[in-house]
Amino acid sequence: NEAYVGGPTYAAMDKLDELTLRVVGALVWNTELGLEQIDRIIEARNRFNTPQFNTPSVKIWLDGVMEVHTAALLEPYTDRDDNHRGNLLIAPELLDTIVTRLDALGFQIHFHAIGDAAIRHSLDSLQVARQINGVRDSRHHMSHIQLFDPADIPRLRQLDVVANFQPYWAWADKFITELTTPKLGSERSRWLYPIGSVLDSGAIVAFGSDWFVTSGNPLLGIETAVTRRDPLTNVSDAFIDSERINLADAIAAYTINSAYVNFMEKDTGSIEVGKLADLIVIDALADLALLKPRFPPDIIYPLKIASEKNFSPS
């Protein structure tokens, strides 16, 4: 989670017992500063560390977005004649040093990487960190990962990096058809949001929303991942149909795999005896509605699964 709500706000709500979520936060790496900020980041991790709100992760922005030519690409944008490839926000050599230091300190790295160059340099830095620090259960992950060079897809599994997609973006809206594919050409556009290919490579795929940029409703993301169509109308053409995934994999990406990214898979993410009952009940239709809640929706009841047939308060 890194959703424009500062750590002190979450911490204050937690202290007042008003935080109705379990929040795993990412501490932001300021790309205008250098290694001197590490002490501040360590202090924040120590300060924000309760069962309800903790910050084990550092988020590093590596590039911008495709629509305004700031995503970092391996090859130039095709709609410009100045050989422009976007912008890496951190030089590769410095990135290697940053990631190696943070990894050695036990931080999980959360990359913002949109373009194929940003994705490659993220993976390169994690490979350097692993060579220097050794292998550990780090669960580093990369978010957004819009455009892959297919040669880098197998590296996710090789380096134990989780692919954190926002599946709601993987359909042919105007951001894709008017602001993205014309900048890349058809050959590269084939590798936009290659969720199916990443799954087939054996990498762990988790889903998020990038709320509040787009809806936090996971049902929209699940439908988009399965159909590659507009989930609100289902009338758009399927966008790179070969990258569709099945329903079970889409649900897993939002549940057990997302719990895994947050080191919470022993407590939540699946319906098992002893786990937290973080669940809702829905009907089975595509145009579904949540069933009427038994309790007022602003009241949160902490539950654990006591048996396969009933729940009891924790």
Annotate each predicted stretch with a short phrase.
Residues 95-100, 104, 202-211, 247, ...:
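C-terminal substrate/ligand-recognition segments
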Residues 101, 124-132, 260:
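Conserved helix-loop functional segments at active or binding sites
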Residues 262-267:
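Short alpha-helix capping/helix-loop boundary micro-motifs
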Residues 55, 64, 112, 142, ...:
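Divalent metal-coordination and catalytic microenvironments
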Residues 147-249:
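Active-site-adjacent C-terminal substructures of enzyme catalytic domains
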Residues 217, 229-241, 246, 251-256, ...:
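C-terminal cap of metal-dependent C-N hydrolases
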Residues 3-120, 124, 155-168, 222-224:
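Metal-coordinating catalytic core of metallo-dependent amide/deamination hydrolases
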Residues 1-2, 108-113, 140-143, 206-208:
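Short catalytic-loop micro-motif centered on adjacent basic/acidic residues
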